[in-house]
Amino acid sequence: MATDNFPQCFDLLMQNEGGYTVDNGGRTMWGVTETVARAWGYVGDMKALPKQTAMEIAKAKYWLPFHCDLFAAPIAFQLFDTAYNGGYPVKWLQSIANTTAVGSGLAAALSVMNVWEVVGRFNALRLQYLASLKQPQYANGRMNRISRNITQGGSLNDATN
């Protein structure tokens, strides 16, 4: 259905992730935790994790398994960002489409809907989820991420929109 929007979606994702941090998830670079990086085979200092390695991890662990390439670009980005950052993106998209289908079946169910209605409803569900989480010190960052995603998602375009 959609073209390969991974490079563009990854660039937008990196605008959300930034660089090196240490938080409850441990040492993280480009949104990749040390645990994930080590499982991938990275042995260096986390501060020096190459962005290319983060891109390879993102594609293999979050883009391909969630079949993001099957969805219109604005939906693919929301799905990808949520899979990467945490949440229940497939469950939320199934709820919006009123289906239990996954992969190509879910993409087909969503393809007959207005892309921007799907994006809006998806982000409403994501905000509800984020509001329910503990660690209120991260609330502003989470809300800013959603705001950026809605704005950035508007810059994505493909033939399916």
Which sequence ranges carry the predicted segments?
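Cell-wall polysaccharide-cleaving catalytic domain and substrate-binding groove, primarily
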Residues: 1-161
